[in-house]
């Protein structure tokens, strides 16, 4: 029997996080209350501010406190002519970590899934179409996940790009660096063979 209704509420609230079950939530709650109350207060303040102040960029739909995010507002990226389409803001972070992309993004916040009632309008493709029509975009890089839904979404966007005379490309899928061939699944291996590249001498 729980001695504190507030503690019960705290543990239940922590369970909204991905991968956090009852035991993990209990450990987190006790850690904050027993050993790090100041950290708990900072966490509470940061969560409160983030939930109330962070919205979506008017151009790319990623998370930001501003109307336009810093990436979209960067003049060098604006004139680059490249847009990379991703499924979530976390994908932007992953791509930015590579340092290999200097264009702008468009975040779908999901993917097409007719069985779940998710259509083009639900993932902002009307906004992307506006950008294709009004901006000087040279190429759209489709970086949706290599799932059935991700591939369907990429194909749909590629057809939109074709309508507006904009080049569309798909990120490569293949064997991970450092991976062993025998451990790679058949689908990935098929993509690797189909997307093989010649040596350049």
UniProtKB/Swiss-Prot annotation:
Q: What is the lineage of its organism?
A: Bacteria, Pseudomonadati, Pseudomonadota, Gammaproteobacteria, Enterobacterales
Query: Does this entry carry the keyword Repressor?
Result: no
Query: Keywords on this record?
Result: DNA damage, DNA recombination, DNA repair, Metal-binding, Zinc, Zinc-finger
A Gene Ontology biological process term: DNA recombination
Ranges annotated as C4-type zinc finger: 57-72
Pfam families on file? RecR_C, RecR_HhH, RecR_ZnF, Toprim_4
Q: What is this protein called?
A: Recombination protein RecR
What species does this protein belong to?
Answer: Erwinia tasmaniensis (strain DSM 17950 / CFBP 7177 / CIP 109463 / NCPPB 4357 / Et1/99)
Supply the gene name. recR
Where is the Toprim domain positioned along the sequence?
A: 81-176
Top-rank taxon: Bacteria
């Amino acid at each position: 029997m729980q001695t504190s209704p507030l503690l019960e509420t705290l543990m239940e609230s922590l369970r909204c996080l991905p991968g956090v079950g009852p035991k993990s939530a209990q450990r987190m709650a006790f850690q904050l209350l027993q050993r790090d109350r100041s950290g708990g207060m900072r966490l509470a303040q940061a969560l409160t501010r983030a939930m109330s102040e962070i919205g979506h960029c008017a151009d790319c739909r990623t998370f930001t406190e501003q109307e336009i995010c810093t990436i979209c507002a960067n003049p060098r990226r604006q004139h680059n002519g490249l847009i990379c389409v991703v499924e979530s803001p976390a994908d932007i972070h992953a791509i930015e970590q590579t340092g290999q992309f200097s264009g702008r993004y468009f975040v779908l916040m999901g993917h097409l899934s007719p069985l779940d009632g998710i259509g083009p309008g639900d993932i902002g493709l009307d906004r992307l179409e506006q950008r294709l029509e009004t901006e000087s975009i040279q190429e759209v890089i489709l970086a949706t996940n290599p799932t059935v839904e991700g591939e369907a979404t990429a194909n749909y966007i590629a057809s939109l790009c074709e309508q507006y005379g904009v080049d569309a490309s798909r990120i490569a899928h293949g064997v991970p660096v450092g991976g062993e061939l025998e451990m790679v699944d058949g689908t990935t291996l098929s993509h690797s063979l189909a997307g093989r590249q010649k040596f350049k001498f």
